[in-house]
Amino acid sequence: MRFNINKSELLNALTIVSKGTASRSTIPVLSGVYIKAEGMGLVMETTDLERSIRYRVPALVEEEGTTVIPEKLLLDIVKNLPEAAVEFQTNDSTVTVSCGKSSFTLKTLDAADFPPFPNVDVSSSIEVPFAEFCSMVKRVAKVVSKDQSRAVLTGVLISTSDEGLRMVATDSYRLAVADIALEGVQENFEAIVSGVFLQEVAGLPKMEENITIGLTANQIVFTYQNMVLINRRIEGNFPNYRQIIPRSWATKTCFTTQELITAVKRVGLVSALSSPVKIDINAEAGNAIINAATQDVGSAEEVVGCEVAGESIQIALNHQYVLDGLMSVSTDQVFFETSSPMKPGIFRAGAGENFLYLVMPVRVS
């Protein structure tokens, strides 16, 4: 096998497929990147048996063939090569990588041992503008649980309806729901997908193109540009999140988003990350007092102007959770709804963005 490829295109391809390698597997070939040189380019594949990634990239192929090269070592080498053409040439169980005045001879792995790329039979699919997909993932992913003992909470519930696409995540202390409207949705589907994997997909190079989301019996398939990313769906039943979203409120407050963010950040300087921030809403005065305190450190408070519908109320919420939710809102205004100090508080984005963020209250003395 022999081919030449532009260094920047090679680096981009390796960076993408590196997300699919198994770094701690007892199967050596899973730590490598499978490369097939054919026709006008290369097919690169990686897998850890849970996820699989395929990427096609143009190259000048002089001799077709296949090989598997240790991915981490190859990526480190390519990162440090000059901006020039990179030549690969295999010989028995080695590959020589040459660029400019540099040359590396590496041991390869047997391509025959590399698992075949999944032959997926997609039962239903939907196309979504990639920029909107990434925006949804960014809003909900930070709520995904890191507790592996409850697998469904480490995932994001993706569902479609006649109205469009929805993503939902919860760690049982908070809940994030993001919606976008789509036209022409032919089939409705629902799947729980790894939150980590979704963030990796959303981290791909941004282009003004659509990403296709497809489902098989036990996998989710993302097709974007010249790449295919497959991951096993998380099995289990996602919590019935709809039943914990209050249908009514006693107080609804409209804040300027950035003003509320900066106020919470400032009072949070005297509190630990898990400490509560108190929001004291005064309906008559048309403001909210944001305050926080930590024993042996001190206290802080800030008055924020707002529009209040309903009654005055005070509620305490986890400081970091509040910031996470507010930082996910991109509209100029944000609405806050609650019905009592011991009921959830709900942040909703303003006009033009369909995003809900629910936080469970903190009991304070």
What annotation goes with each model-predicted range?
Residues 1-365:
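Structural preference for solvent-exposed beta-strand-turn elements
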